[in-house]
Amino acid sequence: MLQIILRRLMKALLWFAAGSALVVLVLRWVPPPGTALMVERKVESWFDGEPIDLQRDWEPWDKISNNLKIAVIAGEDQKFAEHWGFDVDAIQAAILHNEQGGSIRGASTLSQQVSKNLFLWSGRSYLRKGLEAWFTMLIELLWSKERILEVYLNSVEWDEGIFGAQAAAQHHFRTNASALSEQQASYLAAVLPNPRQWSASHPSGYVSRRAGWIRQQMRQLGGDEYLQGLNSSRRW
């Protein structure tokens, strides 16, 4: 009996691995029609008795401002071009910080955030973390860095029901994602740790200071030259 159970479990795991790899491979070229986070937000709104309309318009890489691309990297994951999905130094620093009793600090890379937003539910369980690591490895193996950032910018939440760069640009600044200035981009990047509590268009003092720091980091990264190097980091 035990052997039968183990064989069935192994078969199920193999089917899951093959199926998830196929989905990630398809999404290398096909825009994701939605995300797990969008479904979660919609269900939450139904249970709260206040259904919301989700706003999201997919924009290809060349229709998104370089300012926003650099701002998000500067604010969220400055080792994005170097790592293969996991920032070991940031993980170690977060563990040490959390053990010392500070507020819980995350260390998720952009690749990990894409995995979580696209495929998984919110929470901190070991199962979810394990699945996040699996999807992160698949994404890093099968997508270019450019594609990872493109999907991130079209999937990330920027306010209640606002998903992706185009919806965020229109909602906060009444402009298009392609026209975002350095300052506007820095404010959008500054609210990403908590986009439903912080506002890019009506920033608090903390958000304004964080946006100023992000602009400094954008210039140190090298701006458009950094993106040119990122574009050349294709896998195959």
From Swiss-Prot:
GO CC terms: peptidoglycan-based cell wall; plasma membrane
Biological pathway: Cell wall biogenesis; peptidoglycan biosynthesis
Subcellular location: Cell inner membrane
Keywords: Cell inner membrane, Cell membrane, Cell shape, Cell wall biogenesis/degradation, Glycosyltransferase, Membrane, Peptidoglycan synthesis, Transferase, Transmembrane, Transmembrane helix
Regions crossing the membrane: 12-31
Protein name, per record: Biosynthetic peptidoglycan transglycosylase
Source species: Pseudomonas syringae pv. tomato (strain ATCC BAA-871 / DC3000)
This enzyme's EC code(s): 2.4.99.28
